[in-house]
UniProtKB/Swiss-Prot annotation:
GO BP term (any one): proteolysis
Source organism per UniProt: Legionella pneumophila subsp. pneumophila (strain Philadelphia 1 / ATCC 33152 / DSM 7513)
Name of the featured protein: UPF0758 protein lpg2489
Database matches in Gene3D superfamilies: Cytidine Deaminase, domain 2
Motif JAMM motif per record, residues: 173-186
């Protein structure tokens, strides 16, 4: 049985190396990641069961440890590796953002913020800190709350602006409900933060609300579909 499993793993790796990573299905990609099975299940079978249980790659990447471990043969080591791979992708995106993005490229900025915030189960409030040329200095997640609210204070934001010597920033937060409409509370905190930043000569460029597949710009009062 183990010989058959090993041959299966080698076949998948050969397919990837010969035909390219895009030639693999979602389940095959997961199987390559899982790498090895056990005496009873191959890596392909484990990948199939994980996909059947959680539905799709997005759900798998955002699953908690207990959901992941519910598939017999998958444990903390594979889960830790999966989370590390996810964070590597996030950091790679940010490197690109730092090098390439200016304020004029709003779609890429929105796409980056959506990737970072969309799948959080609790409302999370973040900021992109910019220099006076609107180049990215840092991305930081500043506040985290419950499923439908996060308490946000202007003072720590202003302090961080001064520490980073930022000239401007873009705020963003997610709505775990999936809806990107800005609430009255969102509008009120935006105004408070903008007024606080004015006191230190920093400019609030926008506040973005992240839904499931949409982002809403409070300053532009527009929605964009952002898959």
């Amino acid at each position: 049985m183990m010989v058959a499993h090993t041959a299966q793993q080698l076949d998948l790796r050969e397919k990837l190396l010969t035909n390219g990573v895009h030639s693999l299905s979602d389940i095959e990609l997961l199987a390559v990641f899982i790498s090895s099975g056990n005496n009873k299940k191959s890596c392909l079978q484990l990948a199939y069961e994980l996909t059947k249980h959680l539905g799709n790659l997005r759900n798998i990447l955002n699953a908690d440890l207990q959901s992941f471990k519910s598939i017999h043969g998958l444990g903390e080591v594979r889960y830790a590796q999966l989370q590390a791979a996810k964070e590597i992708c996030h950091r790679s995106d940010f490197i690109h953002l730092q090098k390439e993005i200016r304020l004029s490229n709003t779609q890429q900025t929105y796409a980056f913020l959506k990737k970072r915030l969309r799948d959080y189960k609790n409302e999370t409030f973040a900021a992109l800190f910019l220099d006076n040329q609107h180049r990215i200095i840092a991305y930081e997640e500043l506040f985290s709350g419950t499923i439908n609210t996060a308490t946000v204070y202007p003072r720590p934001i202003v302090e961080r602006v001064l520490q980073l010597n930022a000239a401007a920033l873009i705020l963003a937060h997610n709505h775990p409900s999936g809806l990107s409409d800005a609430s009255q509370q969102d509008l009120a905190i935006t105004e408070r933060i903008r007024d606080a930043l004015d006191l230190v000569d920093a400019r609030l460029l926008d506040h973005i609300v992240i839904g499931d597949n949409e982002v809403y710009s409070i300053f532009a009062e527009n929605k964009w579909v952002c898959n």
